[in-house]
């Protein structure tokens, strides 16, 4: 089909993909994407704002459509120009890292480290380090200090505080409660 013979009204009904395919067939060579967009804009007589609105969808359609191929560096061509064996598309394969096997052999260094370990439960070693053993009998807590710091917990503590506020007789009933 020759799109050059179409009227402007018929051209406006064409999709950008159809026009891009026509332009690439006529040129018979690859084209940079911005140049392709300019030629489509000129062919369809679109304004800059109109082409900008449709540009994202057009680029997506070109990637999805099986007739076009991206050759890198934003250069596009028709897939029909290239035999299947000649297409060198980048195929990304996921490589999973190989798991390292745990070594079953024991190193001599491990045994040396175990021999050098210090047992801190041994009283002789504690004395060598200059530390003193402290027993609970040596440290007595003063019970009087705890009474001052103790506050009732939960809602009982809140209620006790409310009762304390009104014990001096200043409390009068609210007339709205009657």
From Swiss-Prot:
Claim: Methyltransferase is one of the keywords in the record: no
Compositionally biased residues, Acidic residues: 105-122, 141-150, 161-178
Protein keywords: DNA-directed RNA polymerase, Nucleotidyltransferase, Transcription, Transferase
Classification via Pfam families: HARE-HTH (PF05066)
The keyword Ion transport appears for this protein: no
InterPro entries referenced in this protein's UniProt entry, alphabetically: Asxl_HARE-HTH, RNAP_delta_N_dom_sf, RpoE
Family named by the database record: Belongs to the RpoE family.
UniProt name for this protein: Probable DNA-directed RNA polymerase subunit delta
Organism from which the protein derives: Listeria monocytogenes serotype 4b (strain F2365)
